[in-house]
Amino acid sequence: MPVWRGESLLGKTITVQAEQGFGDIIQYARFLPFLKVMGAKSVVLLQHGSLHNLFGQMDCIDTFTNMPEEGIATESDYWIGIISLPYYISLAPAYARSLFPCNLKKIVGSEGYLDAIPSNIPKKLAVNWSTSKGLLHYVRTMHPEKMLEVVGDNAYSFNPEEDRFWSPLPNDGWKKDWNKTASHLKACKGLVTVDTGIAHLAGALGVKTVVIMPKKEFKCWRWKHGTWYDSVVTVEEDELHKIPDLIRRM
């Protein structure tokens, strides 16, 4: 199956390979409607199953699958990695390119591009101090005691591994379903988190969020160039004193 390199998609089926971590996938999902604007007959999204219900609200996606080696994901006319979409948007005709700005002045969907029905949990702050156990886990993760000093204990833990000092979320399967996570997050006052997937979910939902950055040498490019999420404010590790006031303004 050939990689899509900008050929006509009229009457064609294309498989989009979700890449990198959950945050990256949520961040780049805003560009998926572009493929339908370019005439794709069918868009197949190959991704982790925990994201299926969340992205089910996007009518531009015709089929979801988590089977990379057989079935519908292997039967398309083309395939493309989701992170490559902005590049091909930059090469698209003006009528399509203008619908999906991606530059320092404006990034499409920065105001929020996903919906969620708030759950019925009492309104509190949401917190997450830990990232997935990848290469940058110890760079981005914050000591929970330090997070407690900054935000207090009147909050829900959105860390799927442990709750520590904060209230647990209902045991409803949210740890394996990003759509349920979105519903709980939408019910919260706001979110304080380190740089991890929940930050992107909050931004995509338009939830007011403070993202605590790692040391400057490890700060991810996405927080340096353009505004991906209007509802997200970043703070450096020497600016933690600003967080209580940012919480009060949520």
Model feature map: region roles:
Residues 63-68, 173, 232-239:
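Short acidic-hydrophobic, aromatic-tinged amphipathic segments that line or gate anion-handling sites
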Residues 9-54:
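N-terminal pre-catalytic "stem/leader" segment of glycosyltransferase-like enzymes
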Residues 23-31, 37-38, 114-120, 125-127, ...:
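Conserved catalytic-core segment of nucleotide-activated headgroup transferases in glycan assembly
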Residues 83, 91, 203-250:
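Nucleotide-sugar donor-binding patch of glycosyltransferase catalytic domains
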Residues 1-12, 108-117:
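Non-catalytic membrane-proximal stalk/linker segments that position and tether the catalytic domains
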Residues 49-54, 61, 65-124, 130-131:
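A nucleotide-sugar donor-handling region in carbohydrate enzymes
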Residues 1-9, 148-210:
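Donor-binding and catalytic core of enzymes assembling or modifying cell-surface/extracellular glycoconjugates
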Residues 47-52, 67-70, 158-165, 196, ...:
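Short, polar loop motifs at secondary-structure junctions
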